[in-house]
Amino acid sequence: MKNIIVYPFAILIACFCLFGGCTSTTNQVDIQVNRMPGVLPQLIFACDLSTDSAEILLSRPEVINDLKLLHYGIALSIPEYDSGRAKIVQHLNQEDIPVTAWLVMPSKLGYYFNASNASEAPGRFADFETWTATYKLRWASVGLDIEPGLTDFVVLQKGGKLKLLVKVIGRSLSLERKHQAQAARQTYDSLIQWMKKDGYSPQTYQLLFMADERKAQSMILDRIFGIVPAKGGLEALMVYSSFNHVGPALVYSYGKEAAAISIGSTSGGDDSSLNNQFRPLNWQEFSNDLICASHFTHTIGVYSLQGCLQQDFLSRLKSFDWNQTVLIPAKSIDKVAHFRKVVGILIWVLSYWIYMVIIVILLIVLFFWIWRARRIKRKKMKG
């Protein structure tokens, strides 16, 4: 289950780094960051463990006591609408711990919500409402995890850079993918309005690249990866600095464009090779990201609960100084600025490369026509 979170970020970061490095090209200065004034932020800890493991973890008295003391919530993934998952939610309801229904698809449908399975989403939510009513469950909010399907990640992971490039180019040209993305946006927008109508507080969990796509005024990532910029709910950008360890600079850059921020990852996956490359955040990195995220929003998601417990983060938060200042080094700001510049260029190229190819072909044809016309003219003059 842990690899479900690790693979998307690892592979997508590889996609965007395919044509660009991470060297800095701008001149920045160190930045000091504090949390925004007012009430302390609410943390929501994501838990995507199996039912048995989640039940054991969330039955621990010290975990429940810490969550209640700190007024923090849980986002529990709901891959199946069964009695086991319902029992966990009922326990959290009894303890007055806010629970977010982290909605996902069954694994056979790709696990994440996206353009490819959008037609199944309304039925999935209808089943959720039936399940909720059956077990009398209470929800603080309901979240849609919108990411590319797991099958896409497996294909991209095993195919190598050349196969990845071919697939990306093919999808960027596909009118079918374009129409699918447009239809999916309407479906998810309508679904979010349905959630609101039925009294839920909807959220969407989006990859951080969604902010770059918006800035470029493009829909190319929707077409290539199937992600959908659904509107109407609280959008949380998943800004996981554990995949590049540039510190809070990543959160600082994307936080300006986020209504809510999810930070992580505090836990590794089942794949040791990925763990070596994308190690979990340590306490210093985690606490710096927390302060930086709190500079922009009162709602902060944390992936994952199990990782925080393994590293004793939850307990340490009881004495955490939310008024501390975090220094973001200029070097880290430079790296993130360059990374986002590369991402922006790639989005632009992927959006318009076919037009550039057509222009180049036309220029070649024009050059050949001029060359041929001059050659014919010279022959006539000689004759």
Which residue stretches match the model-derived regions?
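Boundary/entry segment of secreted carbohydrate-active catalytic domains
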Residues: 25-63, 204-208, 266
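Catalytic domains of carbohydrate-active enzymes, especially glycoside hydrolases
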Residues: 54-81, 137-138, 142, 234-235, ...
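Aromatic- and acid-rich polysaccharide-binding/catalytic face
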Residues: 72, 76, 219-250
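Active-site-adjacent "subsite" loops/lids of carbohydrate-active enzymes
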Residues: 85-132
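An active-site-proximal structural segment forming one wall of the substrate-binding cleft
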Residues: 116-146, 226-229, 292
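Active-site groove signature of glycoside hydrolases
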Residues: 128-176, 301
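Aromatic-lined carbohydrate-recognition surfaces of secreted/lumenal glycan-active proteins
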Residues: 178-220, 260-270
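Substrate-binding cleft of secreted/luminal carbohydrate-active enzymes
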Residues: 232-248, 260-364, 368
